Amino acid sequence: MEPKTKKQRSLYIPYAGPVLLEFPLLNKGSAFSMEERRNFNLLGLLPEVVETIEEQAERAWIQYQGFKTEIDKHIYLRNIQDTNETLFYRLVNNHLDEMMPVIYTPTVGAACERFSEIYRRSRGVFISYQNRHNMDDILQNVPNHNIKVIVVTDGERILGLGDQGIGGMGIPIGKLSLYTACGGISPAYTLPVVLDVGTNNQQLLNDPLYMGWRNPRITDDEYYEFVDEFIQAVKQRWPDVLLQFEDFAQKNAMPLLNRYRNEICSFNDDIQGTAAVTVGTLIAASRAAGGQLSEKKIVFLGAGSAGCGIAEMIISQTQREGLSEEAARQKVFMVDRFGLLTDKMPNLLPFQTKLVQKRENLSDWDTDSDVLSLLDVVRNVKPDILIGVSGQTGLFTEEIIREMHKHCPRPIVMPLSNPTSRVEATPQDIIAWTEGNALVATGSPFNPVVWKDKIYPIAQCNNAFIFPGIGLGVIASGASRITDEMLMSASETLAQYSPLVLNGEGLVLPELKDIQKVSRAIAFAVGKMAQQQGVAVKTSAEALQQAIDDNFWQAEYRDYRRTSI
């Protein structure tokens, strides 16, 4: 007889009766068998019929369809998550196309704005500046001893919505839901955290329902000392955890990443995850057009930490394809609200300084303006790729897109700002303005575009294609750090799964139904690169794949056996 795998073995638990029914990680609801109902003091606490998880999921799907607004659907799904996590993930995986935009972007933005209004039940950890001296006690209050992934935010720059205070907790909750749904990381291993350092959002401060610390945000040394206390407490409690920074303001995001990426296994998804999925998309789009990314000229609208992170990763990729660093940098043009970044521009942020163009090289440009606008840049650079990370709607105007198309027969246009209300241009407009010739990928989900009786699928440049696989790869390999090369390997693997590259048609990114397969492949590539980089113990390829399989959690009920506490 073959020995049982870990997933086939019974789970021994000490909880029973109503306490067990109130434990989301263990609750099965109507799926508890009659034997389990007897053994765990559940007789009479549930209806008579014993259901399968699929029968439960079908009922939940019918109930879900009864809600008319996206925010009501979000609230309903969160209620299931807080009641029965296994059922929640079975339901979400059964309807991922429909539900991913509801549990994460764009609907999670509204959920963050209304967090205190729709609050039902606590999930995760809320660490207030007022409680900074109790940091160790707070983390010891977390009942899960084997936390492997933490997503933390301070709520200051939530999507394109700005300061949402503790309402930003919706982002770590949603992000970790995707780690599980897409990357197979057990929900028992995940922990959402919000650092409550106050808020400068006057609307929240005036809201009688607001549940956070009613105080202006702490800044400077006080802020960084508080974050450091948190990091040190995390290292003490879970020294091998993967820590993801999420939706920190531009002024803090890069400094925190640079400060801690070599101290704790950590990364910033807004900077590195967005960069990795964007580069993967661009590699695939370039190959589909029969070329390489290094042959393309690229213009960015938005030169914050996310935009500059993408630009630096593009430069690294084009160097891998054979360009010198100088040549690679000359092909990338960054535009912010003050115009094109040049070496003559004052008050540049540290991460912007290497991405400037030399003003002396622009003397022959067709413009009379000292401030070089996006239109000026597009007209003179004649780019192949236009990327929007501005967080401002409508900035890719018809004039700009038509000017780009005039010089590029197959432009790649990527309005990546989210939520949907912040997108630089809609796919419908971009397709129309380029006579159906643009390849479009967006940051938020959009339906296929119908233009002149032809259907154009719109790929969502969704970080969920990257970060779950990175997380799984880190856990499976035991990586102690996340290196740039590990991120590049994730991008390259994502590009290999592009239907447009594989089949010559379809989306430039894989379909959501394939996301678990893609996450497993990315996990293997990331784990292998971690071993090559010396941040994980070397094993055979077979052993790494086995570790990935062993760590991949499925939304299925296990048999329970009773044990004492």
Swiss-Prot record:
Family membership: Belongs to the malic enzymes family.
Disulfide links within the chain: none
Gene Ontology cellular-component annotations: cytosol
The keyword Iron belongs to this UniProt entry's keyword annotation: no
Tree of life domain: Bacteria
Molecular functions per Gene Ontology: malate dehydrogenase (decarboxylating) (NAD+) activity; metal ion binding; NAD binding; oxaloacetate decarboxylase activity
Listed EC numbers: 1.1.1.38
GO biological process, one term: malate metabolic process
Xref: SUPFAM superfamilies: Aminoacid dehydrogenase-like, N-terminal domain, NAD(P)-binding Rossmann-fold domains
InterPro entries assigned to the protein according to its UniProt record, in alphabetical order: Aminoacid_DH-like_N_sf (IPR046346), Malic_enzyme_CS (IPR015884), Malic_N_dom (IPR012301), Malic_N_dom_sf (IPR037062), Malic_NAD-bd (IPR012302), Malic_OxRdtase (IPR001891), NAD(P)-bd_dom_sf (IPR036291), NAD_malic_enz_proteobac (IPR023667)
Substrates-to-products reaction catalysed: (S)-malate + NAD(+) = pyruvate + CO2 + NADH; oxaloacetate + H(+) = pyruvate + CO2
PROSITE patterns: MALIC_ENZYMES (PS00331)
Site feature: Important for activity: 270
Name under which the protein is recorded: NAD-dependent malic enzyme
Subunit relationships: Homotetramer.
Cofactor: how and how many bound: Divalent metal cations. Prefers magnesium or manganese.
Gene3D superfamilies given in the database record: Malic enzyme, N-terminal domain, NAD(P)-binding Rossmann-like Domain
Origin organism lineage: Bacteria, Pseudomonadati, Pseudomonadota, Gammaproteobacteria, Enterobacterales
Class of enzymatic activity (EC top level): oxidoreductase
Active-site residues per Swiss-Prot or TrEMBL entry: 104, 175
